[in-house]
């Protein structure tokens, strides 16, 4: 796991949405540093949202970003439940269809970028439509 820089002395508490947005920006920058290209953020389709859509070569990468202050209760990566995976798969399916694609025609994968405290973990191909 890599360490993420933090800012100390923050004058106010962020809302849950602001915190999520902050970590999504961190994840985007971190993935761009690893060579992925940004496509979209906060993509909403019927009943679901994908935090980031990136490209790695010819592969479309759907990214779920998670943050937990500590590893208590399993940390950030453990919070991507089966139910959440199903919702992400459905949202990606709809997004692909809107862009004239499908899981059969587009090379894609589902990654998780999990921030636990100041540590970042990138789980490539964390789950798929055959899970």
UniProtKB/Swiss-Prot annotation:
SUPFAM superfamilies: Restriction endonuclease-like
Xref: Pfam families: UPF0102 (PF02021)
TM annotation in the entry: none
InterPro entries per the UniProt record, alphabetical: Restrct_endonuc-II-like (IPR011335), tRNA_endonuc-like_dom_sf (IPR011856), UPF0102_YraN-like (IPR003509)
Matching CDD domains: PoNe_Nuclease
Superkingdom of this protein's organism: Bacteria
Disordered: annotated segments: 1-20
Entry GO MF terms: nucleic acid binding
UniProt-listed HAMAP family: UPF0102
Family: Belongs to the UPF0102 family.
UniProt protein name: UPF0102 protein YraN
Species in which this protein is naturally found: Escherichia coli O139:H28 (strain E24377A / ETEC)
